[in-house]
């Protein structure tokens, strides 16, 4: 190859390499951080007073991801407390429940140890309910200051209700309302009922494989590995999702949201494994049935009729014991453990028609 051809080849190679680096850098940046769309009018102009941000907040010494969205920045604040632990539900909420952003300022918080809020540097001894309560309190402080509110509403799902109730007891003055979805009540009793349902169902339909594995696992208490095996059969029998749903389906739906990226995918399993194992022992001891029945704010318990993850009947038993300024219980007849995603239209309508007026009344009275 002549010197001239060599120089041309080098220039082309270097040029392509630089272009590839730029493309990769752009992809990594977008892939890591994602974006959340602005609220715009019919002419494409950003609606005055709306809010649509993605940010990182240092809560309890750990950087955590928060998406804040609302068509009206003066609307009541609602914070989602996702399940798991370690399960970022931002994409699912954005897909199924984004209409709530027209009525609330909705805060999608990715808790410490979950997804993009996961880091190898998080001390395992900070993965405690008390720390999640402290993180939430710090987040609420930021939101109250930024939006000029005295109170917010928290909506917990599954694990989110474990520390959600703990927060209601520690800082009732900050809450306009508490909403528990798939409420954790008494973890030990819930696990016992969940296991028995799964074994009974396996025997009813004569599923030999399920019977054999469940009998080998035996009744709780047991470790996380056995919980996950029991949950797999629970899902197959409609006790986790009324229509059995695969993790692939959930992830596919979740990652349609612009806020969710390849970075979230990379962080998903490490964060979930870390969170589940770190919190398993303490979460197994949760007993709000005996430890938290008095609330100083309105309480809403929303249960899927077929929920055998956090037993639906146990949720209703808990509701019956609750003392609060006002309380409501709602059955979702076509759901198991996740009414927001299994019956989104009914779930959204309930929050708008039943929860919002209560919250607005408290806000008008100084909340």
Regions found by a protein language model. Give the residues of each.
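Conserved alpha/beta-hydrolase
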Residues: 101-119
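Alpha/beta-hydrolase
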Residues: 205-290, 294-297
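Conserved acidic catalytic loop of the alpha/beta-hydrolase fold
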Residues: 131-151
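Glycine-rich "HGGG/HGxG" loop immediately N-terminal to the catalytic nucleophile
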Residues: 90-91, 113-127
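Catalytic histidine-centered segment of alpha/beta-hydrolase-like enzymes
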Residues: 335-348
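A catalytic-pocket lid/entrance helix-loop region that shapes and gates access to the active site
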Residues: 170-222
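The serine-hydrolase catalytic nucleophile loop
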Residues: 88-97
């Amino acid at each position: 190859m002549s010197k001239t051809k060599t120089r041309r080849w080098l220039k082309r190679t270097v040029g392509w390499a630089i272009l590839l680096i730029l493309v990769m850098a752009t992809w990594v940046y977008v892939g890591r951080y994602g974006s959340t769309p602005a609220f715009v009018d019919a002419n494409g102009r950003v609606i005055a007073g709306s809010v649509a941000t993605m940010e990182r907040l240092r809560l309890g010494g750990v950087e955590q991801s928060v998406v804040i969205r609302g068509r009206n920045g003066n609307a009541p604040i609602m914070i989602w407390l996702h399940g798991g632990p370690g399960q970022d539900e931002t994409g699912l909420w954005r897909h199924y429940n984004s209409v709530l952003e027209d009525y609330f300022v909705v805060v999608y918080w990715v808790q410490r140890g979950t997804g993009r809020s996961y880091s190898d540097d998080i001390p395992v001894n900070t993965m405690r309910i008390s720390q999640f309560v402290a993180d939430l309190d710090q987040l609420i402080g930021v939101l109250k200051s930024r939006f000029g509110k005295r109170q917010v509403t928290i909506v917990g799902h599954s694990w989110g209700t474990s520390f959600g109730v703990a927060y209601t007891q520690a800082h009732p003055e900050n809450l306009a309302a508490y909403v528990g979805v798939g409420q954790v009540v008494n973890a030990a009793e819930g696990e016992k009922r969940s296991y028995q349902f799964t074994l009974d169902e396996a025997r009813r339909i004569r599923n030999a494989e399920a019977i054999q594995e469940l009998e080998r696992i035996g009744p709780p208490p047991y470790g996380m590995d056995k919980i996950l095996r029991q949950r797999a059969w629970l899902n197959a029998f409609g006790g986790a999702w009324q229509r059995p749903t695969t993790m692939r389906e959930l992830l596919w739906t979740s990652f349609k949201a612009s806020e969710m990226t390849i970075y979230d995918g990379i962080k998903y399993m490490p964060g979930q494994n870390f969170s589940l194992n770190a919190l398993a022992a303490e979460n197994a001891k949760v007993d709000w049935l005996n430890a938290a029945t008095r609330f100083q704010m309105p309480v809403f318990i929303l249960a899927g009729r077929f929920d055998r993850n956090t037993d639906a009947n146990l949720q209703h038993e808990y509701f019956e014991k609750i003392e609060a300024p006002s309380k409501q219980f709602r059955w979702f007849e076509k759901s198991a453990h996740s009414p927001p995603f299994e019956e989104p239209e009914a779930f959204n309508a309930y929050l708008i028609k039943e929860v919002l007026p209560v919250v607005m009344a408290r806000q008008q009275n100084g909340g």
